[in-house]
Swiss-Prot record:
Residues annotated as catalytic: 331 (proton acceptor), 333 (nucleophile)
Catalytically driven reaction(s): D-ribulose 5-phosphate = (2S)-2-hydroxy-3-oxobutyl phosphate + formate + H(+); GTP + 4 H2O = 2,5-diamino-6-hydroxy-4-(5-phosphoribosylamino)-pyrimidine + formate + 2 phosphate + 3 H(+)
Organism lineage string: Bacteria, Bacillati, Actinomycetota, Actinomycetes, Micromonosporales
One GO molecular-function entry: 3,4-dihydroxy-2-butanone-4-phosphate synthase activity
UniProt organism field: Salinispora arenicola (strain CNS-205)
Record-annotated site: Essential for DHBP synthase activity: 127, 165
Family membership: In the N-terminal section; belongs to the DHBP synthase family. In the C-terminal section; belongs to the GTP cyclohydrolase II family.
Function as written in the Swiss-Prot or TrEMBL entry: Catalyzes the conversion of D-ribulose 5-phosphate to formate and 3,4-dihydroxy-2-butanone 4-phosphate. Catalyzes the conversion of GTP to 2,5-diamino-6-ribosylamino-4(3H)-pyrimidinone 5'-phosphate (DARP), formate and pyrophosphate.
S-S bonds: none
Annotated cofactor note: Binds 2 divalent metal cations per subunit. Magnesium or manganese. Binds 1 zinc ion per subunit.
Residues annotated for Mg(2+) 2 binding in this entry: 29, 144
Binding of Zn(2+), residues: 258, 269, 271
Residues at which Mg(2+) 1 binds: 29
Stretches for region DHBP synthase: 1-202
Protein name: Riboflavin biosynthesis protein RibBA
Length: 420
């Protein structure tokens, strides 16, 4: 059985200028990164990192620092599967030779962590890859980028880190057994992002319960809990039915806001029927949560961008390519705020009402246990069958439905509404 160190031990190592090894969830990258504080970078630390990792050394910085240092994204559309926010690469403008040596990269990294550094002090491109960490850290995105920022901040240092993925001698990624052996050999502390999430949950609160009220609906009587997040301007609502008790085995639907489908009854998607089906299932069971996450319109691209994507779909593009054509991600949602709200409500393990496996992985990374997936039935309509096929075939949604005749592009088809 793997023995992991504590977050307190990791912070002590970071302050002492030593690296730690951080492993993420097995359902995410399932990789271990060597991480240390950027302001304490030395040629020896960088050389050690180069020797035992892929060598693609990155320097996580906060969003504010990336903006201050004029570090734009490496590409206008982030197509990285995990949403890692690479910026343009840099070298120190002065004090380096080619920029690639351990001493040169250590100098550049220290410069990135120095509050006196300005945009003109950096040359672009270079040999160090800054990463833009999500505001809110691992509570918003449980990635190594955010872990590096959280560890340095919690250790009382500048919130700027250095990281790279550990690899075996044959070039394959180190997994937990390999990481254990590596840490034992080099006397390094091994921690998990899940433990860092749990530590921050114990010591910080990122969401605020603003209001609670009785909410009678045509599905039954719920309690409505209104939340606001420190790192999210949107307001979110959780509809809770019954006593959640110990928070185990709770039926949960995390529903992304969709004005067109949920409110206007649009037939272009299946969002409205999914919301109604989830409320019905929770009401039948008499215990559960339907969490309505604001700010997720159009899988996170916003209402007007979604309408622009619809324009492209009317010319033949599918829902994925339409987003990409606009320079936007196929799916820009994160579930960090939603996970914090569920945790604040007392949910610890859940049966998740979803057809989207990525949603399960997105929630499990925040310390919540998904005990099982409950399928939401799908009834296709001529107006949304192409959308459903794309979700199934290109986005990995687990959908089974009877085929129907697709509506002509850009023309409305009169029909009965979509059922649940």
């Amino acid at each position: 059985m793997t023995t992991f160190g504590t977050i307190e031990q990791a912070m002590a190592e970071i302050v002492a200028g030593r690296p730690v090894v951080v492993v993420d969830d097995a359902n995410r990258e399932n990789e271990g990164d060597l991480i240390f504080a950027a302001e304490l970078a030395t040629p020896e630390l960088v050389a050690f990192m180069v020797r035992y990792t892929s060598g693609y050394i990155c320097a996580p910085l906060t969003e504010d620092e990336c903006d201050r240092l004029d570090l734009p994204p490496m590409h206008h559309t982030n197509q990285d599967r995990r949403g890692t926010a690479y910026t343009v690469t840099v070298d120190a403008r002065e004090g380096v030779s080619t920029g690639i040596s351990a001493a040169d990269r250590a100098h550049t990294i220290r410069l990135l962590a120095d509050p006196r550094t300005g945009p003109a002090d950096l040359a672009r491109p270079g040999h160090v890859v800054p990463l833009r960490a999500r505001q809110g850290g691992v509570l918003r995105r449980p990635g190594h980028t955010e872990a590096a920022i959280d560890l340095t901040r919690l250790a009382g240092l500048r919130p700027a880190g250095v990281l790279c993925e550990l690899v075996n001698d044959d070039g394959t990624m180190m997994r937990v057994p390999d990481l254990e052996r590596f840490c034992a050999e080099h006397s390094l502390v091994l921690i998990t992002i899940a433990d860092l999430v749990a530590y921050r949950r114990r010591t910080e609160k990122q969401v605020e319960l603003v209001a609670e009220a009785r909410m009678p609906t045509r599905h039954g009587v719920f309690r409505a809990f209104g939340y606001r997040s420190d790192y999210d301007s949107a307001e979110h609502v959780a509809l809770v039915m019954g006593d959640l008790g110990d928070g185990r085995d709770v039926l949960v639907r995390v529903h992304s806001e969709c004005l067109t489908g949920d409110v206007l009854g649009s037939l272009r998607c299946d969002c409205g029927p999914q919301l109604n089906a989830a409320l019905d299932q929770v009401a039948r069971e008499g215990r559960g949560v339907v969490l309505y996450v604001r700010g997720h319109e159009g899988r996170g691209i916003g209402l007007l961008h979604k309408l622009q994507a619809y324009q492209l779909q009317d010319t033949g593009r599918d829902t994925v390519d339409a987003n990409l054509d606009l320079g936007l991600p196929a799916d820009a949602r994160d579930y960090g705020t939603g996970a914090q709200i569920l945790y604040d409500l007392g949910v610890r393990s859940m049966r998740l009402l979803t057809n989207n496996p990525a949603k399960r992985a997105g929630l499990e990374g925040y310390g919540l246990t998904v005990a099982g997936r409950v399928e939401l039935p799908v009834r296709p309509h001529p107006e949304n069958v192409r959308y459903l096929r794309t979700k199934r075939d290109r986005m990995g949604h687990l959908l089974e439905f009877d085929e129907v005749i697709e509506a002509p592009m850009g023309r409305a088809v009169v029909g009965d509404g979509i059922g649940a």
